[in-house]
Regions:
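Short Gly/Thr/Asp-enriched flexible loops that form oxyanion-binding sites at enzyme active sites
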Residues: 96-105, 148-155, 303-323, 358
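Conserved phosphate/anionic-ligand binding catalytic regions in large, soluble enzymes, centered on
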Residues: 37-57, 141-144, 228, 232-244, ...
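An N-terminal, well-structured beta->alpha segment
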Residues: 4-101, 190-191, 195-225, 236
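Glycine-rich phosphate-binding loop plus the immediately following alpha-helix
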Residues: 154-184, 322-345, 350-361, 416
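Gly/Ser/Thr-enriched, mixed-charge loops and adjacent short helices
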Residues: 32-37, 41, 149-279, 286-287
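Phosphate-binding and adjacent anionic-ligand microenvironments
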Residues: 288, 292-294, 315-317, 335-522, ...
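N-terminal small/polar loop signature for handling phosphorylated ligands or for N-terminal nucleophile
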Residues: 85-148, 251-306
């Protein structure tokens, strides 16, 4: 079957010469042909993501057209404004794919609002809500290597598409011929017919106003003289992040020159992920040279941010996603209580794999902490639930350990722009009282205990990878460990058993160990990986590290 598909693509007058050249190059290579054509990229709640190239199992204009026709078929059943918002990041062909999506939607009589330049995830979520769109499309593969691109789909609330809607769209995609099934008009024709319009300045400024409304101490940064190094990692964060920081009074910003401008090849770091040291290396070097108070880096679609803080001895320390989440929660709570802006019955939300230290901080400030499944859409779902009750002002912060944060209800996905603003405001505040981010983190550990959170990832590439991952999860379910690394397992929670958790079904296993440590195992939702999350608690960092190493040494052989 896949050889027939390859032959058809080879004989079809493809509009992208790169694809034609690739097909010629793989002639006779059955393994490569099978990898590209035996399956298709599957559309889920996170949309599509795959390697760029020719074939149904790759990201290209034909896969994008097919996906958009499926989305269009769904939109046409939804009533409303019959409108879709579109944005894109700096990745290879992101702008091409965004325009292709617009052309298919317009050919289906669906109006499009598309950004005239690359803009990040929060801008797409905001535009979807601002224009009361039926859906949104963000062309990005987030922090994946340069050879990847993707297509995130959003519902009318600006949150990633629900399971039910994604299933309908996927069925429509499957019934659409990949090469000839999508309707299409030219981008210019769509503009001329008034079906395609650019996002207006009113929407763009509305986003900035909404972000600035999340300040805890407005005006503080204008007198704090904060010195900052920032890297957009060749992505979409440069304009929105520097704009918002300038607006709140931070002008001393040094941009990492090699990573300043959009470049989908990501020449300085093969994996543009702010969780990874290599992505932050140039920024750290520049921070040390300039004596900056803080270094920030946002990923290509600017929905996640990583930071390094200056220590009293002049060195710099990377801050984990869990630590930033806890620091922001502590800062927002203390600041809003001080300023009298804390809502009644405040709510914060975190993913279940994020640190329990956040629960302790929330309890201290009288904040209800809700833990949800991994994936920011579940945090967005909690905001939507509050909004439906007329209580959206109760939401003060949502975060994931994977460096995603949101501090207001104006969008329904993680936002590195508001996170960058609040991180800088927090650093400026501690500087103004003779303290520092580092000192406050140590005070939090002293008050609540030395929690350590680490994640190990195990890759399973290729067509067989998904089967291997499924086999490992099945083995763990049928052979639950009684002990891990010498620590007795006192509780096992299987999130596929919804009657136990009260949450939607998820492929997640949680092991509670004697002494309070936890191990969580789950497959990644976006990459061919299984992740193991370790939380340990010790009298000091050395003890917590030792326990983590004992646990990971015992568990790692299962993933080999």
């Amino acid at each position: 079957m896949y050889m027939n598909d390859y032959k058809r693509w080879n004989e079809f007058p493809l509009e992208d010469s790169d694809l034609t050249a690739e097909l010629a190059k793989i002639a006779g290579d059955e393994a490569e042909i099978k990898d590209r054509f035996a399956v298709s990229l599957k559309f889920g709640t996170a949309g599509l993501r795959g390697v760029l190239g020719a074939g149904s199992n790759r990201m290209n204009i034909y896969v994008v057209r097919q996906a958009t026709q499926g989305l269009a078929n769904w939109v046409k059943t939804q009533g409303g404004n019959q409108l879709v918002a579109i944005s894109y990041d700096s990745r290879i062909k992101s702008d091409v794919f965004a325009k292709e999506a617009a052309c298919v939607l317009a050919a289906n009589g669906i109006k499009v609002r598309i950004y005239d330049a690359l803009m990040p995830v929060p801008a797409l979520s905001f535009a979807t809500r601002y224009y009361k769109a039926n859906a949104g499309i963000m062309v990005t593969a987030s922090h994946n290597p340069a050879k990847y691109n993707g297509y995130k789909a959003y519902g009318p609330d600006g949150c990633q598409m629900t399971d039910d809607a994604a299933a309908v769209v996927y069925a429509e995609i499957q019934s659409t011929d990949i090469l000839e099934g999508a309707k299409r008009i030219s981008f210019e024709e769509g503009i001329a017919q008034g079906l395609i319009e650019y996002v207006g300045d009113d929407c763009k400024e509305g986003l900035y106003d909404a972000i600035k409304a999340c300040q805890v101490r407005p005006g503080l940064c204008k007198t704090a003289s904060l010195k900052l190094v920032y890297s957009p990692l060749n992505g979409s964060g440069l304009v929105p992040v520097t704009r918002i920081l300038n607006d709140i009074g931070i002008d001393d910003i040094t941009i990492v020159p090699e990573q300043k401008y959009p470049d989908g090849n990501f020449p300085t770091c093969p994996y543009p992920n702010p969780e990874i040291f290599e992505a932050l290396r140039l920024g750290l070097e520049l921070a040390k040279q300039s004596g900056a108070d803080l270094m920030l880096a946002t990923d290509p679609d600017a929905d996640r941010v990583g930071i390094a803080m200056k220590c009293p001895d002049g060195s710099y320390e990377l801050v984990s996603g869990n630590e930033v989440g806890v620091l922001l929660l502590d800062y927002i709570c203390a600041g809003r209580i001080e300023k009298g802006t804390m809502p009644a019955n405040p709510v914060a939300v975190k993913s279940l794999v994020s640190t329990p230290l956040a629960d302790a901080v929330a309890a201290h400030y009288g904040v209800e902490m809700r833990s949800v499944l991994t994936g920011f859409k579940w945090i967005g779902d909690q905001i939507a639930g509050l909004e439906a009750k007329g209580e959206v002002e109760r939401f003060i912060l949502g975060f994931e350990e994977s460096y995603g944060y949101l501090a207001g209800p104006y969008v329904r996905d993680k936002d590195a722009v508001v996170a960058s603003m609040l991180i800088c405001e927090m650093a400026a505040y501690y500087r103004s009282i003779g303290s520092s981010v580092k000192q406050r983190m140590e005070e939090i550990y002293a008050q609540y205990g030395r929690y350590l959170n680490k994640v190990d990832s195990f890759e399973f590439p290729g067509l067989s990878g998904m089967d291997k991952m499924a086999g490992i999860m099945a083995f763990l379910r049928s052979n639950p460990p009684h002990a891990i690394g010498g620590y007795d397992v006192v509780k096992v929670t299987d999130y596929q058993k919804t009657e136990e958790t009260g949450l939607p079904s998820a492929n997640v296993l949680v092991y509670g160990l004697e002494g309070g440590a936890t191990v969580i195992v789950r497959p990644s939702g976006t990459e061919p990986k299984i992740k193991a999350y370790y939380t340990t608690l010790g009298k000091d960092i050395a003890e917590a590290e030792e326990q983590k190493n004992e646990l990971s040494d015992a568990l790692t052989p299962l993933f080999s």
